[in-house]
């Protein structure tokens, strides 16, 4: 296992650095590292690492969501107004609809399998979008028009919305049924997640004010609570549940509202955690990709991905109706809101891990979508 960890970190970071040097996202280098090291090429990774790959990817997702919550400016969301709110769910919904329409005809999937694939692909990647938008704001591009703020505001909530839909579709695939209650549970689980997360965030802010402990210890406490929330959601068998991932993000938001200086310091700590988590996430996703399977579905998968992206871009166009943005600014926003990476890497392998017949296909298309859109 130790050899596998060293190979993942050293080669993953090295390939990421090479990609950065040629103006490509570092995650592409990490994905390639995983594919080469994985069981379908060189087979250099220990089974013990591959066996806990799903848990490690979930930890990475928890880290990026908490970091997003600690840094999300809700006042900015209110200032931008209607378009920012629409960007949280309209483009993802359009892309999901596009996938449900295209995938069954081109890839022979059922509507539910297509919905699972659509939910995996529909999220935009904070790992790609956030650094680029922050750079644009630092350089002053589009700030007066609110373009970077608009994309940043929608990106984090967009992810959580899609993950909740994904969890719902997976539950239906496992035989839990497609009852009306299942769909009613979507907004309820979102609101319960928000309420639970905010409550925990406020309580933690009060606790951290009374108890003077190191920031590293605070991070460990938040991580432990986040893990407990995920386990609780998995164990709940009631018709009405809560979204643990939304709760995790809103812990950061609640903490930020009450103790902004602490939230900023913790965001920096989570940023350092993400350095390692990102390498493990993308290398391990690459390791699960069956290269032979990629060859079989390549062209059809490309058509489905591009078709669904066209639906997504139209969704962004709908969100921007009534704004003062010029044609080029609208086109930039439509393209900037397409990159895939973090969520696809975190949940793309779940259908395969659960033994779904569409699992290999979903993972392959997810990785192909990352390779295709991340450089945009």
Task: Place the predicted regions along the sequence by residue.
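Transmembrane helical cores of multi-pass secondary ion antiporters/exchangers
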Residues: 1-376
């Amino acid at each position: 296992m130790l050899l596998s960890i060293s190979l993942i970190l050293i080669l993953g970071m090295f390939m990421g650095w090479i990609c950065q040097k040629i103006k490509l996202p570092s995650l592409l280098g990490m994905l390639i590292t995983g594919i080469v090291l994985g069981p379908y090429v060189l087979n250099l990774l220990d089974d013990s690492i591959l066996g806990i790959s799903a848990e490690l990817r979930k930890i990475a997702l928890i880290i990026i969501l908490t970091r997003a919550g600690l840094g999300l400016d809700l006042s900015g969301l209110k200032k931008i107004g209607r378009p920012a709110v629409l960007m949280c769910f309209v483009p993802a919904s359009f892309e999901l609809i596009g996938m449900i329409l295209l995938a069954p005809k081109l890839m022979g999937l059922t509507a539910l399998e297509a919905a699972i694939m659509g939910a995996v692909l529909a999220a935009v990647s904070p790992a790609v979008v956030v650094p680029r938008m922050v750079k644009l704001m630092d350089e002053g591009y589009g700030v007066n028009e609110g373009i970077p703020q608009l994309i940043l505001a929608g990106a984090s909530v967009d992810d959580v919305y899609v993950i909740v839909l994904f969890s719902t579709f997976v539950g239906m695939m496992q035989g839990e049924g497609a009852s009306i209650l299942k769909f009613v549970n979507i907004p309820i689980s979102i609101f319960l997640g928000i309420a639970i997360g905010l409550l925990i965030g406020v309580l933690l802010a009060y606790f951290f004010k009374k108890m003077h402990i190191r920031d590293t210890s605070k991070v460990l406490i938040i991580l432990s609570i986040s893990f407990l929330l995920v386990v609780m959601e998995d164990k709940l068998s009631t018709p009405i549940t809560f979204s643990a991932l939304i709760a995790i993000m809103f812990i950061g938001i609640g903490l930020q509202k009450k103790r902004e200086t602490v939230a900023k310091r913790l965001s920096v700590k989570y940023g350092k955690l993400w350095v390692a988590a990102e390498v493990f996430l993308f290398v391990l996703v690459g390791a699960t990709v069956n290269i032979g399977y990629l060859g079989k579905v390549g062209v059809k998968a490309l058509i489905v991905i591009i078709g669904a992206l066209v639906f997504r871009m139209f969704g962004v166009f709908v969100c921007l109706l009534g704004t003062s943005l010029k044609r080029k600014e609208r086109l930039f926003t439509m393209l900037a809101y397409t990159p895939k990476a973090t969520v696809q890497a975190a949940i793309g392998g779940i259908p395969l891990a659960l033994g779904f017949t569409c699992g290999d296909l979903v993972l392959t298309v997810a990785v192909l979508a990352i390779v295709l859109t991340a450089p945009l």
